[in-house]
Amino acid sequence: MSKPVVSTPLCSILHELRTAENSGSYFQPKLRSLKAANPKLKLLDVGSGWGHMGCSLAQALGPAGRVVGVDISPESISHAREVAGRCGLEDRVDFVQGDAYKLPFADNEFDVAHAHQVLAHLERPWDVIAEMVRVTKPGGFVAIREGDLESEIVYPAEPGLLKFHKLIATAMTARGKGGGGADTGRKLLPWALKAGAKRDQITVSYGTWWFDTPEHKDKWAKAMTGQVRDGMVGEIAKKTGLATEEDLEEMATAWEEWAAREDSSLAMMHGEILVEK
């Protein structure tokens, strides 16, 4: 990846909410089928970040399975290994540094290759899908899930939140340079086809994220305010003049007020694909 997407403590706030159960239900039936035939499954988690999803996937595979997470950031790899240790999974999960555009693995090495909320950040996501297919064994599958920010609904739709939505969508699209962006979830099928997969190999589905409990709203709001005050969104806004300091503070305050409300909620669609090999 030419410009690494580095997980931060603010990113980790949301990563901790992601599990194989709530973010991987679309591939669980196929995973169970493979596991019944071979308990010693090997799964690759591409863009593994701080390791929370990889550890959850290891628990889903069971004691005989193994997960390898790959990420461009050495800081993320170090933290992911700490997470695996805290979960008691260091013998079943490993994390290695590598480039998603050129995965450091042999052809046909994994039963499953998985990515979650990764392609939205990349300029050539179809090339990453092709790499994931390459390292997957015949009879295995690739599983990818990506958010579609353009489908987001939020209540109440306060002006500061609407400004934020427009800004982050613009920032993501600019960063993707014609690849990933704010509408990534709906593009997984054409990208898989561009990667060389045949249509009858691909299964498409859609899922939903929603945040309505105080705990989950607080985590979401902290991550979004972090993006505005210290993260990618604020950085791009300042460099390009898309928003002033006053605009950014209005957005951050709007998220804090949204999280504190009893009647607030948010939902977003996610695209999901399985590519069978």
Question: Which positions does each model-derived feature cover?
Answer:
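Class I SAM-dependent methyltransferase Rossmann-like catalytic core
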Residues: M1-E21
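C-terminal helical/coil "lid" or tail adjacent to the Rossmann-like core of SAM-dependent
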Residues: S2-V6, K163-L167, Q201-L266
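Conserved alpha-helix/loop element of class I SAM-dependent methyltransferases that forms part
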Residues: E16-K40, S56
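A short acidic, Gly/Pro-enriched loop at the edge of an enzyme's catalytic core
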Residues: Y101-V112
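A short SAM/SAH-binding and catalytic strip from SAM-dependent methyltransferases
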Residues: D111-P125
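Conserved catalytic/acceptor-binding region of the Class I
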Residues: A143-K222, G226
